[in-house]
UniProtKB/Swiss-Prot annotation:
Family to which this protein belongs: Belongs to the TelA family.
Organism: Staphylococcus aureus (strain MSSA476)
Lineage: Bacteria, Bacillati, Bacillota, Bacilli, Bacillales
Signal peptide (UniProt feature, chain positions): none
Entry protein name: TelA-like protein SAS1347
Length: 378
């Protein structure tokens, strides 16, 4: 799996506000683009002096979105349990270890029959076990591929969440700068005007206007602080999203390594082990065949010697006895006579069977004719 490029990008730090103290942040206008400054001016105009209700609503939409985003993040973390993935990988390791190539070693039998029977039994047994485990590994591979697909989708979803968080961060930064800009404007322009007017006027309401403006500025400052807290949450959320992504990425890479490397390597090693076992058994069988051949040659030589002696002894005996020839001739004549009788009986039985077959054929034809006539009448 190609590493997501965004993993290499850290969350943007404070591009607009340089001071580390949230409550004493100052505007850095030189870092704003022209488009951003226009957005700040537009947002700043949304703050109407002495409009407490409007001030309370200022930036609240962003904070609500942040709240919804936090719930979405929580749901994402709670609903994605990586436990089954670890269990599947552990199951895979267990299956791969269940067939050990060392188990393919067999004892050297002393007899040819034992060699062939044991070798065949051992190979078939191991091959059967390997096929069974291979089928289980294939099923586990399908599960791992599903897990990998889910992890990939989760990584893409987290990228979307990361982009949303980045947008919240940027929007909150602009709102904070706009609020600070409005605060400075009120402190440097509006409040001095009201103070000067109150000093020159005898109307007590002008003094109250000054107090109201001061309280509004204080509330605006508190509102800025609240937005800064929300912005800090967005800033802290970025690395949390990346950590979750990194875990998913590591698991996806582990799954890919298992599917593309570990499993094929295991199958190759098992194939090699079986081949070596067959070679070892073939060598042992060839050795046994050679030994058996030598034993047979020796035994045949002994048998040939014995046969030669017995044959020579028999050759020294006289010609066949006359009684034996008479008995043999009588048996031949009786055999011929019995054969002729059997042939005669066979011809008679065949003739009888032929007549019976003709009668059966005639009966069948008559029966079929009757059936055909009955069908026509129906």
């Amino acid at each position: 799996m190609t590493e997501n490029k965004s993993f290499k990008e850290s969350h943007p730090l404070d591009d607009f506000i340089s001071d580390k103290e949230l409550s004493n942040t100052t505007i850095q206008k030189e870092k704003l683009t022209i488009e951003q400054q226009k957005q700040v001016d537009t947002i700043s105009k949304q703050i109407n002096p002495l409009d407490n209700e409007g001030l309370l609503a200022f930036g609240s939409d962003l904070q609500k979105q942040m709240s919804q985003f936090s719930h979405q993040m929580l749901d994402e973390v709670q609903s994605k349990d990586v436990g089954p993935i670890g269990d599947t990988l552990s199951d895979l390791i267990s299956k791969l270890k269940s067939v050990n190539p060392n188990e393919l070693n067999t004892d050297k039998p002393s007899m040819l029959k034992r060699i062939f029977s044991r070798a065949k039994s051992s190979i078939n047994e191991i091959f059967s076990r390997m096929q069974s485990v291979s089928a289980q590994v294939d099923r586990i591979t399908i599960q791992l591929q599903k897990h990998q697909t889910h992890l990939t989708r989760d990584i893409e979803l987290l990228d979307t969440l990361y982009d949303k968080n980045k947008q919240y961060f940027d929007d909150l930064s602009l709102h904070i700068i706009a609020a600070q800009q409005k605060k400075l404007q009120l402190e440097n322009e509006k409040l001095p005007q009201l103070q000067q007017q109150a000093q020159q006027s005898t109307n007590q309401m002008d003094i109250q206007h000054v107090a109201d403006m001061q309280q509004f500025i204080d509330r605006l400052d508190k509102r800025i602080y609240d937005l800064q807290l929300s912005r800090q949450i967005a800033l802290q959320t970025a690395p949390q999203i990346r950590m979750i992504q990194n875990v998913n990425q590591a698991l996806a890479e582990k799954i890919q390594s298992s599917i593309l490397t570990s499993i094929p390597l295991w199958k190759n090693q098992m194939a090699i082990a079986l081949t070596l076992m067959r070679q070892r058994n073939a060598v042992a069988a060839q050795r046994a065949v050679t030994d058996t051949t030598n034993d047979l040659l020796t035994a045949n030589a002994e048998m040939l010697k014995q046969n030669a002696i017995e044959t020579a002894t028999e050759n020294e005996r006289g010609i066949v006895d006359l009684d034996t020839l008479k008995r043999t001739q009588r048996n031949i004549i009786e055999t011929i006579e019995e054969t002729l009788i059997i042939q005669q009986h066979g011809r008679e039985e065949r003739q009888l069977a032929e007549k019976e077959l003709q009668q059966l054929e005639q009966d069948l034809k008559s029966h079929l004719v009757n059936i055909k006539g009955t069908n026509k009448q129906s």
